[in-house]
Amino acid sequence: MAEKLHISVLCGGQSTEHEISIQSAKNIVNTLDAAKYLISVIFIDHVGRWYLIDQPEMFLAHSPDHLVKEGSARPITIAFGDAAKPWQSLNGDGRRYSADCVFPMVHGTQGEDGALQGLLELLNLPYVGANVQSSAVCMEKDLTKTVLRAGGIPVVDWHTLSPRDATEGVYQRLLDRWGTSELFVKAVSLGSSVATLPVKTETEFTKAVKEVFRYDDRLMVEPRIRGREIECAVLGNGAPKASLPGEIIPHHDYYSYDAKYLDPNGATTTTSVDLSESVTKQIQQIAIDAFKMVHCSGMARVDFFVTPNNKVLVNEINTIPGFTNISMYPKMWEASGLPCPNLLDQLIELAIDRHQEQQKLIRCYEVKARSL
């Protein structure tokens, strides 16, 4: 019988998406096949402290904060030098804990922006999802669009602002440029529609800019696209494949954080999408092309707008898509014939395969000094 792989699922973090991360991690832990894997959870609290939860059933039954308070979550630190045992106890015994592969499910800042991926690279650990560079590019929405547009991928137009930029007259210039007074002001590097605000007047625009700068040091403005919100899941490394598309039908004014996570009737999500075969194939091909363009690996969800005249526009790429029981990434793959347990198996296999390929690369180049 093959030895079980030890999978560490990372969640929490110092991010506005902390709670969503925990929901995603719970669904993954609940879905992973315990006959194949030894499962532990690494929880990062709001101030950045790390904890090990090695009883997955406790994690499923209680909040991580509750487990920390009662002592079931052990405080740990990062231990370099032994990739097989990267977690070290802070309880005084110095015990080290193993991991064969890490499944990062820390959404947003410090989890999806390359910071966590860089740490896992330094630990020489296989991990699920995009590498440092791809994570950083996709987290910065304006950089994502710059790269995609340069590669010929159609994107929603945008304008970027920093706190140093003067905002006087910007709204009118953008209105003239796009021919609409309806705009979105959003943080460049946040997800889940955090700090994303619709505006229709210059007064609302000025207020929104001030509000978004409370969350990020750069923001982007986009014209509001009156079209269908379509998503497509991508899976793979060198030869990625795309799922059947899904659709978000918001019941709020737009697909806000509240509509996504707080209001059970905030939106309808469906994997039975009424699109022509040609548009469906176009979405799938653009999703794969975008995935390759930013050198993603493992997984990503590509979000689109489809206009009334069937123009397909990429909105953003999410390298750690939600994995809650209502999240679209696993649902789209299930609709495409790949159930979530098998999807998780493939993601872990892809992570280990990529790590093994990386280990074959020459990292040190010895040059003999020429004698003088």
Swiss-Prot record:
Pathway: Cell wall biogenesis; peptidoglycan biosynthesis. Its EC number is 6.3.2.4. It is found in: Cytoplasm. ATP binds at residues 176-231. PROSITE patterns: ATP_GRASP, DALA_DALA_LIGASE_1, DALA_DALA_LIGASE_2. GO terms for molecular function: ATP binding; D-alanine-D-alanine ligase activity; metal ion binding. It catalyses: 2 D-alanine + ATP = D-alanyl-D-alanine + ADP + phosphate + H(+). Mg(2+) 1 binds at residues 303, 316. The lineage of its organism: Bacteria, Pseudomonadati, Pseudomonadota, Gammaproteobacteria, Legionellales. One of its GO terms (cellular component) is cytosol. This is D-alanine--D-alanine ligase. NCBIfam families: D_ala_D_alaTIGR, PRK01966.1-4. The gene is ddl. Its cofactor is Mg(2+); Mn(2+). Its main location: cytoplasm. HAMAP family: Dala_Dala_lig. Cell wall formation. It comes from Coxiella burnetii (strain RSA 493 / Nine Mile phase I). It comes from the Bacteria. Binds 2 magnesium or manganese ions per subunit. It is an enzyme of class 6 (ligase).
